[in-house]
Amino acid sequence: MREIPVSQVTDTVERLCIEANTHLPGDVKRAIEACRACEDGDIAVGVLNNIMENYQIADRECVPICQDTGMACVFLEIGQDVHLTGGDLREAVDEGVRRGYTNGFLRKSVVRDPVRRGNTGDNTPAVLYTEIVPGEQVKITLAPKGFGSENMSAIRMFKPSAGLQGIKDFILETVEAAGPNPCPPIAVSYTHLRAH
């Protein structure tokens, strides 16, 4: 059994909060560049050029890619042969978020109560997902989820008769209804549960 102090989790989450908000992953950069290469509309080309310039400046200056630095979504894959020591895992993650958003000078926009709108002042609590996996490693992935994407998202429960075409129609209706409101670039995707 491998022992890992939760302080390492805190330190890693702090670092990832800053990195995720200032450095766009390579696969995302390549996708944006590929879109730019095949785009021929002047406005779209201009928007994509601005996005590319923005992430280049963010990389170089270590400043946030976007003013909406989001809610920290933390994904933990914890090896079944790991014993986390020295404190509470949930608090260790939240302390990492607290430090990352403070030390990285990132905007704190999480509210305690969505009706009363009182800001927590430190961007906690994080959204935390855990999965137990084989081995003696801990893998931490952090994704800052901007709130603009939440405001433009939609969900619908389909009857089985809707079929794939019903789902496609809903996606197109949702994108059209959102219009110019979400920040570009807009990525359309779906999520599903893995069957075990």
Model-derived segments and their meaning:
Residues 1-188:
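Non-transmembrane, aqueous-exposed alpha-helical and coiled segments at domain scale
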Residues 191-196:
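Conserved small/polar residues in nucleotide/adenosyl-binding loops
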